[in-house]
């Protein structure tokens, strides 16, 4: 998790941090998280900002305990440089693609799948497809924005909610393309 790099090591121990992202809710997505949580005003907002500021300070200080950073993508490596002023070597994580067979025969729809939260920008995709009534979109995923997504979906959009891996796999194989709009850590 985001705090693992803060471990205090002995002088003779090497500390290597494989970083998937600097803590997004205190750095690059700070304002989005506060807005989505309704914490921009009032006492709760003040306390949240105070605590996030403290976490940001701790995060920066703890980054100096790391001997070497490894990032999961060049994109995250740049964010490590911007956030901690530290270099990182990129080693991409292993991805098991053995469960996904190539399907040559595509059906007439596009697919997006994600946890339905604001920063994944599924609403942006749904709004765009609602304006392209000749294009079909299938949305798979659950989360706090599920009902919002259902309300804004046009007639050409099927919102399936959470589905099993088998259903997701089938839809991924048959879709014309996967549509993605989020600012994702893997780049």
Task: Identify the residue ranges that each predicted region occupies.
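Short hydrophobic "strand-cap" motifs at the C-terminus of beta-strands
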Residues: 72, 94, 112-114, 140-141, ...
